[in-house]
Design a protein with these regions (language model features):
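An anion/pyrophosphate-binding glycine-rich loop and adjacent beta-alpha core
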Residues: 34-36, 41-42, 50, 56-57, ...
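N-terminal Rossmann-like FAD-binding beta1-loop-alpha1 element of flavoenzymes
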Residues: 2-29, 406-411
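Short hydrophobic core segments
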Residues: 5-7, 30, 132, 145, ...
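A glycine-rich dinucleotide-binding beta-alpha-beta segment and adjacent secondary-structure elements
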Residues: 127-130, 134, 308-388
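Glycine-rich active-site loop/strand segments that organize a redox cofactor
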Residues: 47-95
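Glycine-rich loop(s) and the adjacent beta-strand/alpha-helix scaffold that form part
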Residues: 153, 157-203
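Glycine-rich FAD pyrophosphate-binding loop
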Residues: 21-45
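Feature captures the FAD/FMN-dependent oxidoreductase FAD-binding
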Residues: 76-157
Length: 413
């Protein structure tokens, strides 16, 4: 019976352990935190967006960070396989808007508990509060791991599934990259992905906590369009966040890395309406509220807190009577409604990112087995690999698929 050590008890590590045990290996999971699955507990705002109910190509499309590398892993362990595994072990799931799959209970804890139940039933040993500092090798193969306390765990195969470098309080502190680097693996430079953006626009503090739905946000760099997303966003005390902002953050991080500093976010507040139709809508509202001041004449069009900001960008006096607004002023107003400008200064720190971009280079990993090309018996799974996707369950699916494939291959090492 092969002995397999899994370093990390997150989504990828738990699936790797389950797969290895299912295929006959003696498995030990070494988790540095007191409890496994801590990052899983905070995903999907504590609800755990398990995966996405879409086809393979759509999943790959939504993992812009080396998604094609995952083609084999995603075929070997699909989104349907994830859902079936959880359902078969007592966890009911549901599909929400955008194909996002959640537990019916809306509790991430139930997902973690189900995965731990699977490991228990398969006889997997789980050791917590233990820090792996070195993967031990002999000539061309791995032979085990060494911990911070000096304890050695012998193994025929080691799966590094220690996560990325975001949310270090959950154990995802970049330690997996150090293990790989010590073994000679190339680490693609780390940067935040799925991270809020910072802004120095003066009105940001006034909009803190304001959520916008069904808007189109577009990133521009020195006037050139870089990326665009439709959906929901949120103004914060430091800038902007929310699903579409997180999706755009990868583009912003890349622009910043390329020393692009003139970055703006233009928000189309009414993307369903063309310029002409929106202008007609504004004109109807102005006719209805012709005797009111401009600030009060737009209450049917925008959230109250947003109106002064829009009027300011359109160079309009909020106290001016609606019936005195000229055609030219109305056009200026519509231009801002179709492109509210937010100056972007940067991203929040890597530690606050939902996902880490960068990691162990995919050029040194076999895509069909997730085995290291440098060492026999060494495997990688999850966020430690240089893969990252958008919000919507794609990153967890990547973790589950790579974990399952690495675990299966390691069992036969």
């Amino acid at each position: 019976m092969n002995k397999v050590i899994v370093v990390g008890g997150g989504a990828a590590g738990l699936l790797a352990a389950a797969a290895a045990a299912e295929h006959g290996a003696q498995v030990t999971v070494l988790e540095k935190m007191f409890k496994p699955g801590k990052k899983l507990l905070i995903t999907g705002k504590g609800r755990c967006n398990i995966t996405n109910d879409c086809d393979l190509q759509e999943i790959i499309k939504n993992i812009p960070g080396n998604g094609r590398f995952l083609n084999s892993a995603l075929r070997q362990f699909t989104n349907e396989d994830v859902v079936k595994l959880l359902n078969d072990n007592g966890l009911e799931t549901k599909v929400e808007r955008g194909g996002r799959v959640f537990p019916v209970s809306d509790q991430a804890k139930d997902v973690v508990d189900t995965l731990l139940k699977i490991l228990h039933d398969l006889g997997v040993e789980l050791v917590t509060d233990i820090c792996v500092t070195e993967v031990l090798t002999d000539t061309e193969k791995v032979i085990g791991v060494k911990t911070k306390s000096g304890k050695v765990f012998k193994a025929d195969a080691v799966i590094v599934a220690a996560g990325g470098a975001s949310y270090p309080g959950t154990g995802s502190d970049g330690s997996g990259f150090k293990l790989a680097e010590k073994l000679g693996h190339a680490i693609i430079p780390l940067k935040p992905s799925l991270v809020p953006l910072t802004s120095d626009s003066p009105y940001i503090p006034d909009l803190q906590g304001l959520s916008l739905r069904n808007v189109q946000a577009t990133v521009y760099s020195s006037g050139s369009k870089a990326a665009s997303e439709f959906g929901e966003m949120l103004f914060t005390h430091f800038g902007v966040s929310g699903p579409i902002i997180l999706s755009l953050s990868k583009t912003v991080a890349a622009l910043l890395k390329a020393n692009k500093t003139n970055i703006d976010l233009l928000i189309d507040l009414k993307p369903a309406l063309t310029f002409e139709k929106l202008e007609a809508r504004v004109q109807r509202d102005f006719e209805q509220y012709s005797r009111k001041q401009l600030l009060n004449g737009m209450k049917d069009l925008l959230p109250q807190r947003l109106i002064p900001v829009v009027l300011d960008q359109a160079y309009l006096d909020e106290e001016k009577p609606v019936n005195q607004i000229s055609k030219e002023e109305r056009k200026r107003l519509v231009e801002v409604l179709k492109g509210l400008s937010v100056s972007i200064t940067g991203t929040r720190p890597l530690a606050e990112a939902i996902v880490t971009a960068g990691g162990v280079s995919i050029k040194e990993i076999e895509p069909k087995t997730l085995r290291s090309k440098l060492w026999q018996g060494l495997y990688f799974a999850g966020e430690v690999i240089d893969i990252d996707g958008y919000t919507g369950g794609y990153n967890l699916q990547a973790a589950f698929s790579t974990g399952y494939v690495a675990g299966t291959a390691a069992a036969y090492q």
